[in-house]
């Protein structure tokens, strides 16, 4: 039965993927590396490889069920990372008149996220990183991964929050993501 073999293949793929992540984390910890730049042979799993379907939805400014804003700041080893201008606008996916913006996007480099949807739906923070095409969850951000030497911290209005990519964006909230050496 082809459907059974296809499903079994999916199980093996998930197991192999999990094994690769565990081996990568172990090798990364032993090499005391906090990102892939110094450890290029390790294939890092990325959340951007399996984007949330909401990251592929396109909108314009008319008929919105939701139009909210949150602020995002990202720090990697003490240095603030710039969030690109017009991220999620006129992309390969969202480029049509009347639908040239992704559901979460920026208009400038201030870190202000625009959450705009046709219906009033919950929007996970991970959708923004999927649109950006970069990794973000409890295991790390960009090519930086949590290890025995480095940690990932996220705060919402200064309060620690461990929801990471699953955090549902709320109007007016300030999100700070910090990747740093453990103290």
What are these model-derived regions, one by one?
Residues 10-183:
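Ubiquitin-like/PB1-type beta-grasp interaction modules and other compact soluble beta-rich domains
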Residues 1-12:
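Single conserved hydrophobic/aromatic residue that forms the stacking wall/gate
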